[in-house]
């Protein structure tokens, strides 16, 4: 009777183990699909934001790739590098708030026009900030600081050196 009971228990364990393995495989596939969907959505929204400015998908992909490489070179964790890679395509999302007559103007901007175009960093920050999601927090920082310069001549705040968040220094 003990033998029979043990065999029944072993059958139950095998069945449940198989069910758990299948559930785990399903979760892994679903998680991968969600991650890919999130990244593709971000890429497509970034392309849409830059569409009026003749930006291409290749620009967004290059930006993402170079930011990841620079983050790695800076010694950031693999998780942080991936976060920066995923968030960086949103750097110019604020351009959706820039009027066409300025954004699409050929040639050099007047001081006034430059002031208008420079607002895209703050607009992007306002669009992306306020989320609890780490990805959007990083994207907001990148949007706000990707035109800052190490010597303090950048915009919108004229930050200098180490006061520029690492994500912004990488994206610049």
Question: For each predicted feature, which ranges?
Answer:
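Heptad-repeat alpha-helical coiled-coil signal-transmission segments
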Residues: 2, 6-9, 13-16, 20-23, ...
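Histidine- and acidic-residue-rich, metal-dependent catalytic cores
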Residues: 29-172
